[in-house]
Amino acid sequence: MPGNSFGKLFRVTTFGESHGPAVGVVIDGVPAGLPLTVEDIKFELEFRKPGRLYVSGRREKDEPEILSGIFNNRTTGSPIAVIVRNTDVISSFYEEIRYKPRPGHADLPFIMKYGYENWDYRGGGRASARETVGRVIAGAVAKKLLMLADTWIAGHLRSLGPEELNEEVTFEEVLCSKYSPVRASKKVLEEKYEALIKKATQEGDSYGGIAEVITKNPPIGLGEPVFDKMKAELAKAIMSIPAVTGFEYGLGFMVSKMKGSEANDEIIRKDNKIGWKYNYAGGILGGLTNGEDLIVRCAFKPTSSIRKPQKTIDLRNLEETYISVIGRHDPAVAIRGVTVVESMVALTLVDHAMRAGVIPLVKLTEEQGNIVQQRWERYVRSCKPMEESQL
């Protein structure tokens, strides 16, 4: 099963299955001298962890174990291997799925490609979103390394089901959304999202949503003009996330309804620099980052595992039947998915930053390491619960 690695210079390989002993990641290409601790990784993992309000009831501790690549809280330049053990597995929930592939899931395509006898039906196996633990671990490393360029990445849930954000949002509000149980950047929206989740849970159903990720101060010129355009690289990265069904940046599909005179973003002087008036392009022009905020959005489909009975085929007799999926599943995968999107944006940007020479390939100086650590600590402090002013 190829296709488990991402990146060229900052190369990430994830491994493990939903109900296997562990999931994990190997990160190759991290320069030496980057300050890095288990706590740095846990900070990001906490926001995709199950067992919290409004997400999957699977109570995983998600404690990362660093196996290699770090000594005295600094990277050594060798591959970083990290595992997270699966400690709350109930495979008995999936016995029915063994013979009845779930609508909306990868079950049947996996059986068709790899063979029924080779299919790990427990929790979705390799196709499970549990795989994204490795992405978030690598994303934490990438986010910290990007602090060398003072590049910050944060996301929020722009819509959930029929409810959506219809006003401007500040980057500070997006940072604060990390502590919202439904990743809302506004209190009033949080209440609407919570009501929807409660409704879906009662009905045995689920909702989809749109995640938006904003990158502040991205290095200028990341990406390559032809096949490795930044928009193409981000699209591939984000579309590889389980349950993601669409991608856009800047004005996205809305631009198709506009005139050129409306869609063209005028070039102006801004803070004594050359810039763009509205950032309609979402920080990417000609396949290159232009220094404006990098703004991407992606659509998550509703969670496929739902209690409502749905038609399927019993593989034992090839007769039509019904399945009602039991177990512990997210009523909206988009909530925890926001952190995964942030991670994939970080992995894409850090790889291109290294390719462009913005981040050193071999090692960080002691001064650079100290700068990274100071900025990381400021980032962690900035991610705080919403204030009453956001009501």
Swiss-Prot record:
Cofactor(s) required for function per UniProt: FMNH2
Keywords assigned: Amino-acid biosynthesis, Aromatic amino acid biosynthesis, FAD, Flavoprotein, FMN, Lyase, NADP
Pfam families linked: Chorismate_synt
Pathway info: Metabolic intermediate biosynthesis; chorismate biosynthesis; chorismate from D-erythrose 4-phosphate and phosphoenolpyruvate: step 7/7
Catalytic activity line of the entry: 5-O-(1-carboxyvinyl)-3-phosphoshikimate = chorismate + phosphate
GO cellular component: cytosol
Regions annotated as coiled coil: none
Residues binding NADP(+): R48
Gene Ontology biological-process entries: amino acid biosynthetic process; aromatic amino acid family biosynthetic process; chorismate biosynthetic process
Keyword Lyase annotated: yes
Stated role: This reaction introduces a second double bond into the aromatic ring system.
Name of the protein in question: Chorismate synthase
